[in-house]
Each structure stands twice: as structure tokens, then as C-alpha cells.
Amino acid sequence: GGVLAASDADNPALAFVPAAQDGAFGRLTVDAGGAWTYTLGAAAQALAGGEVRTEIFTVTLNDGSVTTATVIVTGTDDAPVISAATGTIVEDATPSIGGTLTARDADNPTLAFVPGAQNGAYGALTLAADGQWTYTPGPAAQALAGGQVVTETFTVTLTDGSTTTVTITVTGTDDAPVISSGTGTLVEDATDSVGGALTASDADNPSLAFVPGSQPGGYGTLVVGADGQWTYTPGPSAQGLAGGQVVTDRFTI
């Protein structure tokens, strides 16, 4: 602001006409004494750093004469306002999670995110130019134990080179092991034994194994190794079976 001056020996009542005027980048107000104030408006935020604009306002006095007030506006490089994001997902509860990042820069109305995909330790993040993001757990998340919590942070970039982050918390669940059963058929005195292999897998327990040992049954003995290999050998009681008689031995491993 400042003060405009006006004097007229023939008109001691000379004064400015109080008024407010809107310019392209702000508003000028003048009172009767010539005091003026210029207030920046929203449009000034769009000026790039170092960009210079001039506003000229015509000011009227009460005798009809006019003068001008000139204001020079210089823009500054406004920092962009960028959000970060967090997300939480439970293994196997949902296939993915997502959200929206926001970015605003008065000096750069075309500011956008750089789209792409990033692989993390437990999943992948995909990002669109408009800030839409999706996180999808990968196979490594299956190895998390029940209740185990891990966090991974992705850094995403905008077209002006600035960055922000997406932080994901992944909680593991107790995956049920996948275990096969086994069956075998044996004819008395035709073969000495019958065998096969049981399988077991558990994403939460890669060291899962069978408890080795032997179990007597009604008509023979089952032997199981830690790797699931099993052998059934008929015992003396099998000799008591009549021709064509069929019996079943069941074992819990």
C-alpha cells in the first residue's frame, strides 16, 4: 500500500473518491485521503517463480480528475501440496487394497503422478497418473505366520520430480497345511509289502515334516519316514484271512 497525494489551491476540498477495484491478480482499495491498499487474489498463486505482472488502476478525485496506481506483482515458486497414503491388508482376507494420492501445485496445473508398478517384499504397488493406487499381496505374503505384521513403503514420483510415499501394513494369517492321504492294496503272500509317499506343505512352516515311526495295525505294521515315505508289511494275523476275505487297516499319521 501507500498514499496518493493531490492538492489544488483553488479547491481545498479536493479528495479522492473512495473505491475498490478488482484487477487481474488482486484488488486495490483507495480512501478519501489517498491511502491505498493492494491485496493479492487467488489468481496470483498461479504465477510461476520470477514471473512479473503489472497492474495499473485508474483512481478518480472528487473534481473528476484522475491518476493511476501501478502495482508490480512478482510470482514465487509455490511448493506443491502432495498427500501420502497408508493402507492395511490381512493376508487372504482381500485380494488387494487401494486409494488415491492427491497433488496440487498452483504454479503447475498439469502436475500428475508418474504411472508405473513397483515390487515390494510382500506385494506390488501400481500407480496411475491421477494418483489411484492398488497394492496386491504376492506369494511371499503367504509365508507370514498368523498375526505376523510387516510394513513396506513405496516412494512414488510426480512429473515435477517431487515424491511422496505409500506405506502398506500386511498382517499374516495362519494358513492351514495341505496334507495328502495314502492308500494301498496288498494280496496276502503275493508281495512282501506295499508303500507310497505322503505329502505335506505349509506356507507358514517350510520345515513341516512327518513324525517318523511305526504303528501296528490289525493285520500288519506301517512304517513312516520324516519325508512321508511309508511302507506297510503284513503280519502273522494276515495269514488267518480266508481266501477272498477283504479287511482294512487304517493308520493316523
What are the roles of these predicted feature ranges?
Residues 1-22, 81-119, 178-216:
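Extracellular ectodomain surface segments
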Residues 35, 79-85, 132, 176-181, ...:
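Glycine- and aspartate-rich repeat motifs characteristic of hemolysin/RTX-like Ca2+-binding segments
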Residues 68-70, 79, 110, 165-167, ...:
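Residues at or immediately flanking beta-strands
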Residues 21-75, 92, 118-172, 189, ...:
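Acidic, turn/loop-rich segments in luminal/extracellular domains of secretory-pathway
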